[in-house]
Curated annotation (Swiss-Prot):
Role played: Large subunit of the glutamine-dependent carbamoyl phosphate synthetase (CPSase). CPSase catalyzes the formation of carbamoyl phosphate from the ammonia moiety of glutamine, carbonate, and phosphate donated by ATP, constituting the first step of 2 biosynthetic pathways, one leading to arginine and/or urea and the other to pyrimidine nucleotides.
Enzyme class, UniProt record, top EC level: ligase
Segments of this protein annotated with the region Carboxyphosphate synthetic domain: 1-401
UniProt cross-references to HAMAP family, sorted A to Z: CPSase_L_chain_A, CPSase_L_chain_B
Species in which this protein is naturally found: Listeria monocytogenes serotype 4b (strain CLIP80459)
Reaction equations catalysed: hydrogencarbonate + L-glutamine + 2 ATP + H2O = carbamoyl phosphate + L-glutamate + 2 ADP + phosphate + 2 H(+)
Keywords assigned by UniProt, alphabetized: Amino-acid biosynthesis, Arginine biosynthesis, ATP-binding, Ligase, Magnesium, Manganese, Metal-binding, Nucleotide-binding, Pyrimidine biosynthesis, Repeat
Protein name according to UniProt: Carbamoyl phosphate synthase large chain
InterPro entries: ATP-grasp (IPR011761), ATP_grasp_subdomain_1 (IPR013815), CarbamoylP_synth_lsu (IPR006275), CarbamoylP_synth_lsu_oligo (IPR005480), CarbamoylP_synth_lsu_oligo_sf (IPR036897), CbamoylP_synth_lsu-like_ATP-bd (IPR005479), CbamoylP_synth_lsu_CPSase_dom (IPR005483), MGS-like_dom (IPR011607)
Amino-acid positions noted as binding ATP 1 in the UniProt annotation, renumbered to this chain: 129, 169, 175-176, 208, 210, 215, 241-243, 284, 298
GO molecular function, a single term: carbamoyl-phosphate synthase (ammonia) activity
Residue sites binding ATP 2 per the record: 707, 746, 748, 752, 777-780, 820, 832
One cellular component (GO) term of this entry: cytoplasm
Length: 1070
């Protein structure tokens, strides 16, 4: 079938901000789709609210709208651009839900817009739990016994019939949001209430729990001619009951017999044909390990997280081909871009094993509930490829960057028996390490299988790894065992620990017997056809398939798995750096291990190595490629942390030298540099013991800001207001010693300002100055950033430009740097300098039209800013206002405090752009998911220090028609200021409390600032959690509340009675 010529313009809907359950995989899918459609000659219009994505670059579509993905804004874009069709299946759950909303509102009919890929009927059949169950019954495919419920009474009726445990699956939600396994009535009430609130159609499926079955996924494709094929099948190591996004996954499946594989394959193809999906689809199935019985769990009628994994695991570009199928091309017409000779209907064949391990943010959220279930909690994932499951697993473990280079975690090894049993029987994010610890203590694989239902095959493989560990320890420096260990995926670092030598000694041992990895090609066809894919993985075999080209090359280190503090922004910079290297005439090589990202699309670079970002693994690639140098500025702290080890092995680090990087990151060296440059910073010192920290704090005065040196995302950073609190921090939050000092600074409660700059060593370009809405003390990644700065005087701006220029040249920066300042009146203090790319670089690149990573890379390669066409100094400011608003995933992480502070908590961001600050903020808030009510009730409960400021906010809320509700202390303050207020009871009082009002939907906005003391802290935490779980916006900073208020005021109107009166009535606004 030829591609369709009756459509000219296609609207692609993106997935919006990064949240748990919907991450960088949709930037990868959307980028592929836009390029694929443009390749076919279509005019592409894109809407996405996330500025930190490659897909929102101007080159990716004919028209790019960085606007909220809401019915209002997408309808406006459709009416303006008049697309012939929309493609929603590459924008995750956001894209599907938006297509359904547009249809329900009549916009698609009104503007005569066709839905491509998966039609609305198929979306409804797959996403609506009742329609899906009915379809499976029609097809004769088994689903677990279930019922559709719309309220708690219906849930009780179902449970009375089949008993506990039951699984709750809300309709039209992402990453299992609101769902879970319920073992008792209390869990049922909590989960069903949450699920019904989060489901856009107030619908949940309750089903009999089949926890313990094997969970298997099939990634399938279908075209308009009803050709269908399996791209990849994947097996979850964890059985049914844990969300697939939180499971360790292996591809291809390892424990299915041929009969089981074919049985489930046939079911998957039958389902995609029944749904008449044109494109990609993910089918999840549960298989009884003791029989051939199976159930269909669910179908994602779109490109998904698993699609990205399947694409990277096989090399088969699912999103690219799904876009071509959506416009009428068929699988037997489209060439497989991997081989260039075969067609897309050939099913990929793997002669290697792929392991995926999820990455969690529990290092940031120590109080979070780490228990895994049907609601996803991982922020990202890593993938590794090997010739065996053991090798792939161990490579994936060391890719996680959790301080483990092997299946060995200190907490697991030192756990008492009760903790060990709990961690094995009730799975958390680190269960893999506790399984290894149990095997070391002598538990059998049969015992572990009985407790976990993990297949004996995987437990057997783990036990063989532990057995090999023991032989390694018993035979120090034995060459045969060394070779066996390397083939099994063991790292030099772990072997060095076993033999009590350093890593270099292990390397020398390997060198003596020429024991080095070779690189194999990912070619989709197990070498059956000739392939030229520049996509490689390492393994210890004989034949090497990666050969160095004659062209000079540059290696760019990626940023690894997405986590809080190091997100998709760094992948954005990595991709742009690669393109700049290619433009400069060099071969660009990427090393990375994240299957979700654009950077690990093999078509982006000249060569892709899918490898752990450890010194050993990176050095192996360097030895074979012999690059001109390595770029570390764009891979976040992951890449920066490797720089020292690489330099010591003679590798040239391109850009800012190691010594100068250390001067920026090492506190004492940085203080000396600031002294020489005569740039002020808040008073502070480095402490290497608890006593020293107390002395420093006493000298400079409380409150103080404390943080460990060399961190990203403000990990373990805190504002401390007393000696008691400081002692608690020093003994609980950090392990302080001379090798790991802690920084103690005077806390300046001023206005925070952020600057990204590029330096060529002589000239410094400053694309823009951003101010934060929230005052200093809230992490920059969690603050609302505004460009151009609205509240800074010309004098302050000139000072910032002067300090930035002095810092860049004084620290000998070559490439990018990010500086954070605090402004107190007209005084400017530098807080920190990061000699690398930052999370604001994509945002600033988009709005200033200065491609920062590209320009910085050209500078790193030796060019200067003036020759590249840039004038040093501050770039001319834009007339429009741009805001970057953080997005949080608190609804997925129960028990996490939503209050903002120096430790970063946001998972993503959105952009708002308009002619006024209020309009830009409105777009930003709406795009972030904040519900903006024009009237309602504001609950105020604030700390004593904030009460005076809260009075002014309450007056303004009252003036535009909001009702004010407050707890006793805050209410008294408001009453004294003659502000009408309803006093509500605190938590624990016998009558109806503020929690009841929140749960009953009587509150539209909560403003709650942190109060010290155990009881107020506990109450504040409960208020904030209840607000999040009931979908109510909660502000823990008065600055954020004021920003929301500004927006609401801008949307209100003056209302004044025309009656004349001797007593002049105050104006009211609503």
């Amino acid at each position: 079938m030829p591609k369709r010529d009756d459509i000219k313009t296609i609207l692609v809907i993106g997935s919006g901000p990064i949240v748990i359950g919907q991450a960088a995989e949709f930037d990868y899918a959307g980028t592929q789709a836009c390029l694929s459609l443009k390749e076919e000659g279509y005019r592409v219009v894109l809407v996405n609210s996330n500025p930190a994505t490659i897909m929102t670059d101007a080159e990716m579509a004919d028209k790019v709208y960085i606007e909220p993905i809401t019915l209002d804004f997408v309808s406006r874009i459709i009416r303006k651009e008049r697309p012939d069709a929309i493609l929603p299946t590459l924008g995750g759950q956001t894209g599907l839900n938006m297509a359904m909303e547009l249809s329900a509102a009549g916009i698609l009919d009104e503007c005569n817009v066709e839905v491509l890929g998966t039609d609305l009927t198929a979306i409804k059949k797959a996403e609506d739990r009742e329609a899906f169950r009915d379809l499976m019954n029609e097809l004769g495919e088994p689903v677990p016994e279930s019922d559709i419920i719309h309220n708690l009474d219906e849930a009780y009726t179902f449970v009375e019939r089949i008993g506990y445990p039951v699984i709750v699956r809300p309709a039209y939600t992402l990453g299992g949001s609101g769902g879970g396994i319920c073992h008792n009535e209390q869990e049922l009430i909590e989960t069903v209430t949450s699920g019904l609130k989060l489901s856009p159609v107030t619908q949940c499926l309750l089903e009999k729990s089949i926890a313990g079955f094997k969970e298997v996924e099939y990634e399938v494709m279908r075209d308009a001619n009803n050709n269908a094929m399996v791209v990849c099948n994947m097996e979850n190591i964890d059985p049914v009951g844990i969300h697939t996004g939180d499971s360790i996954v292996v591809a291809p499946s390892q424990t299915l017999s041929d009969r089981e594989y074919q049985l489930l394959r046939d079911v998957s193809l039958k389902i995609i044909r029944a749904l008449e999906i044109e494109g990609g689809c993910n089918v999840q199935l549960a298989l009884d390990p003791d029989s051939y019985n199976y159930y269909v769990i669910e179908v994602n009628p779109r490109v998904s997280r698993s699609s990205a994994l399947a694409s990277k695991a096989t090399g088969y570009p699912i999103a690219k081909l799904a876009a071509k199928i959506a416009v009428g091309l068929t699988l037997d017409e489209v060439r497989n871009p991997v081989t260039g000779t075969t067609f897309a209907h050939f099913e990929p064949t793997l002669d290697y094993v792929v392991a995926k391990i999820p990455r969690f943010a529990f290092d940031k959220f120590e109080q979070a509930d780490r228990r895994l279930g049907t609601q996803m909690k991982a922020t990202g994932e890593v993938m590794a490829i090997g010739r065996s499951w053991e090798e792939a697993l161990l490579k994936a473990v060391r890719s996680l960057e959790i301080g483990a280079d092997h299946l060995l975690l200190e907490e697991a090894e030192n756990a008492d028996e009760a903790t060990l049993e709990r961690k094995i029987c009730f799975p958390e994010d680190d269960r893999l390490f506790f399984l290894a610890a149990a095997l070391r203590r002598g538990q059998t694989i049969e015992q572990l299988h009985a407790k976990t239902k993990i297949d004996l095959f995987f437990l057997y493989k783990l036990s063989k790894t532990i057995e090999l560990e023991n032989r390694i320890k018993e035979n120090p420096q034995n060459q045969e065992i060394l070779a066996e260990a390397k083939r099994a995926g063991f790292s030099d670092a772990f072997l060095a620990t076993c033999w009590n030598v350093d890593e270099q000694a292990i390397y020398d041992l390997r060198k003596a017997q020429n024991l080095f990895p070779v690189y194999k090609m990912v070619d989709t066809c197990a070498a059956e056809f000739e392939s030229t894919t520049p996509y490689f993985y390492s393994t210890y075999e004989e034949e090497n398939e990666s050969t160095r080209s004659a062209k000079e090359s540059v290696i760019v280190l990626g940023s690894g798995p997405i986590r809080i503090g190091q997100g998709v922004e760094f992948d954005y910079a990595t991709v742009h750096s690669v393109w700049a290297i290619q433009q400069a005439g060099y071969e660009a090589i990427i090393i990375n291990n994240n299957p979700e990202t654009v950077s690990t699309d093999f078509s982006i670079s000249d060569k892709l190595y899918f490898e752990p970002l450890t010194l050993e693994d990176v050095m192996h690639v360097i030895e074979i490629e012999q690059p001109l140098g390595v770029v570390v500025q764009f891979g976040g702290q992951t890449a920066i942390n490797l720089a020292d080890g690489l330099a010591k092995r003679g590798v040239k680090i391109l850009g800012t030298s190691l010594e100068d990087t250390d001067r920026a990151e090492n506190r004492d060296a940085f203080e000396k540099a600031l002294g020489i440059l005569q740039i002020p910073q808040p008073a502070g010192k480095t402490a290497t013991s608890v006593e020293e920290a107390i002395n420093v704090a006493t000298d400079i005065g409380y409150p103080v800001l404390v943080r460990p040196s060399y961190v990203l995302g403000g990990r373990a950073m805190e504002i401390v207001e007393s000696e008691e609190a400081l002692k608690h921090y020093m003994t609980n939050a950090v392990k302080v010693n001379p090798k790991h000092p802690v920084l103690v600074d005077r806390y300046v409660s001023g206005q925070e300002v952020e600057v990204d700059a590029i330096s060529d060593g002589e000239n410094v370009l400053i694309p823009g100055i951003m101010e934060h809405i929230e005052r200093a003390g809230v992490h920059s990644g969690d603050s609302i950033a505004v460009y151009p700065a609205q509240r800074l005087s010309s004098q302050v701006k000139n000072t910032i430009v002067d300090y930035t220029t002095r810092l860049a040249t004084g620290l000998n920066i070559i490439g990018m740097l990010n500086i954070q300042y605090v402004v107190d009146g007209e005084e400017v203090f530098v807080i920190e300098v990061n000699p690398r790319s930052s999370r604001t670089a994509p945002f600033l690149s988009k709005i200033t039209e200065i491609p920062m990573a590209n320009v910085a890379t050209r500078v790193i390669l030796g060019e200067n800013l003036i020759d590249l066409g840039y004038t040093p100094g501050l770039a001319p400011e834009k007339q429009e206002i741009f805001v970057k608003v953080p997005v949080f995933s608190f609804a997925k992480l129960r028990s996490v405090d939503t209050s903002l502070g120096p430790e970063m908590k946001s998972t993503g961001e959105v952009m708002g752009k308009d002619v006024t600050l209020e309009k830009a903020l409105y777009k930003g808030f709406v795009a972030s998911g904040t519900t903006m009510h024009d009237y309602g009730t504001v609950l105020l409960t604030v700390a004593d220090r904030d009460k005076e400021e809260a009075v002014e906010l309450a007056k303004r809320f009252n003036r535009i028609g909001f009702t004010i509700m407050a707890t006793k202390g805050t209410a008294s303050t408001l009453e004294e200021a003659d502000i009408p207020v309803s006093q509500v009871k605190k938590i624990g009082e016998n009558q109806e409390t503020l929690i009841d009002y929140i749960r009953n939907g009587q509150v539209t906005l909560v403003v709650n600032t942190l109060t010290t003391g155990k009881r107020p802290e506990r109450d504040g935490f409960q208020i904030r959690r209840e607000s999040v779980e009931n979908g109510i916006p909660v502000c823990t900073s008065l600055d954020t509340a004021e920003a929301i208020l500004r927006v609401l005021e801008s949307r209100s109107f003056e209302l004044e009675s025309m009656n004349t009166s001797e007593v002049k009535q105050p104006k009211a606004r609503v």
